[in-house]
C-alpha cells in the first residue's frame, strides 16, 4: 500500500468532452474531490484517452482538456495538495491498459453495462474497440497509482469490481504487483435534476440545454434559466419529490449552495409563491457561478501557468506510474530494456 503522510491514496478522473462543468457534476464529484485533498494523497486527472473512445474534433478536445483542468483548479484543487494531470501526459496508462486487456476474458468485458448501453445506441459499425476496452484502461488508471480507494457512485461499482478482480488475478498469476483498492463511497449528495425536466438527472445529453446550469455560462443567461425552471400549477413552496419535482429540485439546489435546511426554506417562502423562490435562487446561483467563471478565465488567460501546473502533476504521476509499470512488466516476464 502506498501512503503519503499515512493518508490513503485516491485516484479519480473527469472527461474533457463537455466544455463547461454543470452544477450536477460539480456537486456530485468535484466538490468532494476538493474536500479529499485534506484527507487523502489525491491523484486527479483529465481523462483524454477515455474521451477518444467516441469521435472527437482534435481542436475541441485540446481546448476542452485545458478548460476542464482550469475548472478543476477554479473549483479549489490545489497543485500543492493534490496531483493534477492529463492522462495522455503519462504514457504508462496505455501500456498497463494493454496488460489488463490480456488478462480479461472476452465474455467478462462483454458484460460491462456501459459498453452494452452505448453500443446498443450506436450500433456495431459505429462502436469502437476502444469503447469495448475502456473498462480495462480504467482499471489500469487505478492500479498504476497503487490507489487504496476509488471514489465511486452507483454507476461505477461494476468498474471497481472489475479492478479488484483483475488486480487479484494478476497478483495470483504473476506476483504481487498491485494494491487491491476498496470503494470510497462518495457522500450521498443531493441529486440535481434538469430545470426543464425535473424527473431527469441534470446531464449534457439532455434534449435541450435550457435545463442545464453550466458553470461557465453568462450569469444573466444562468439567472434566466433558473427563473424559467419548470414547476407546477400549485403555488405552495414545499419539498415533495413525487408530486412537486420541479419545486423540490429548486429547493435542493438552494439548500446545497447555501447550506440552508430545506425545512427552513419552506418556512421562508411560505405564502410567497414560486416567483420569489426563483428570483432569490437565481441570485444565489449567479453569486456562485460568477467567481467560478472568473477564476477559470484567469487560468485560461495564463496558459503558461496552467501548462506548468499540468507538467508538474504529470511528472509526479509518472514517477509513481513508471515504478508500477516496471514491476508489472518484470512479473509478466518482459525482457528489460538496457540503456
Swiss-Prot record:
Report if keyword Protein biosynthesis is assigned: yes
- Which chemical reaction does it catalyze? tRNA(Trp) + L-tryptophan + ATP = L-tryptophyl-tRNA(Trp) + AMP + diphosphate + H(+)
Q: Which parts of the sequence bind L-tryptophan?
A: 141
**Keyword Cell division (UniProt):** no
GO CC terms for this protein? Answer: cytosol
The source's domain of life comes to Bacteria
Q: Motif span ('HIGH' region)?
A: 16-25
Which keywords has UniProt assigned to this entry? Aminoacyl-tRNA synthetase, ATP-binding, Cytoplasm, Ligase, Nucleotide-binding, Protein biosynthesis
Task: Tell me the function of this protein.
Answer: Catalyzes the attachment of tryptophan to tRNA(Trp).
Q: Which family does it belong to?
A: Belongs to the class-I aminoacyl-tRNA synthetase family.
Instruction: Name the NCBIfam families for this protein.
Output: trpS (TIGR00233)
Give the PANTHER family listed for this entry: TRYPTOPHAN--TRNA LIGASE, MITOCHONDRIAL
UniProt-recorded name of the protein: Tryptophan--tRNA ligase 2
Amino acid at each position: 500500500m502506498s501512503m503519503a503522510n499515512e493518508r490513503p491514496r485516491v485516484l479519480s478522473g473527469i472527461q474533457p468532452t463537455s466544455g463547461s462543468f454543470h452544477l450536477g457534476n460539480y456537486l456530485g464529484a468535484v466538490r468532494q474531490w476538493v474536500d479529499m485533498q485534506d484527507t487523502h494523497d489525491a491523484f486527479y486527472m483529465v481523462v483524454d484517452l477515455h474521451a477518444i473512445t467516441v469521435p472527437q474534433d482534435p481542436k475541441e478536445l485540446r481546448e476542452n482538456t485545458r478548460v476542464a483542468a482550469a475548472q478543476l483548479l477554479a473549483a479549489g484543487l490545489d497543485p500543492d495538495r493534490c496531483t493534477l494531470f492529463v492522462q495522455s501526459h503519462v504514457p504508462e496508462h496505455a501500456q498497463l491498459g494493454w496488460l489488463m486487456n490480456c488478462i480479461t476474458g472476452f465474455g467478462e468485458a462483454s458484460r460491462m453495462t456501459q459498453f452494452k448501453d452505448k453500443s446498443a445506441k450506436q450500433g456495431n459499425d459505429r462502436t469502437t474497440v476502444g469503447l469495448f476496452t475502456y473498462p480495462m484502461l480504467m482499471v489500469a488508471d487505478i492500479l498504476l497509482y497503487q490507489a487504496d480507494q476509488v471514489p465511486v457512485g452507483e454507476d461505477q461499482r461494476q468498474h471497481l469490481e472489475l479492478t479488484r478482480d483483475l488486480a487479484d488475478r494478476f497478483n495470483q498469476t504473476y506476483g504481487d504487483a498491485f494494491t487491491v483498492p476498496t470503494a470510497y463511497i462518495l457522500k450521498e449528495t443531493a441529486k440535481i435534476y434538469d430545470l426543464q425536466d425535473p424527473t431527469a438527472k441534470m446531464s449534457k445529453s439532455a434534449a435541450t440545454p435550457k435545463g442545464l446550469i453550466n458553470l461557465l455560462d453568462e450569469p444573466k443567461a444562468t439567472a434566466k434559466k433558473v427563473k424559467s425552471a419548470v414547476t407546477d400549477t400549485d403555488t405552495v413552496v414545499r419539498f415533495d419529490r413525487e408530486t412537486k419535482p420541479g419545486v423540490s429540485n429548486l429547493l435542493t439546489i438552494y439548500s446545497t449552495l447555501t447550506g440552508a435546511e430545506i425545512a427552513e426554506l419552506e418556512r421562508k417562502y411560505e405564502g410567497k409563491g414560486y416567483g420569489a423562490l426563483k428570483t432569490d435562487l437565481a441570485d444565489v446561483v449567479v453569486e456562485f457561478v460568477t467567481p467560478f467563471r472568473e477564476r477559470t478565465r484567469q487560468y485560461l488567460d495564463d496558459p503558461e501557468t496552467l501548462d506548468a501546473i499540468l507538467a508538474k502533476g504529470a511528472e509526479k504521476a509518472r514517477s509513481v506510474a513508471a515504478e508500477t509499470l516496471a514491476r508489472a512488466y518484470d512479473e509478466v516476464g518482459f525482457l528489460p530494456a538496457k540503456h
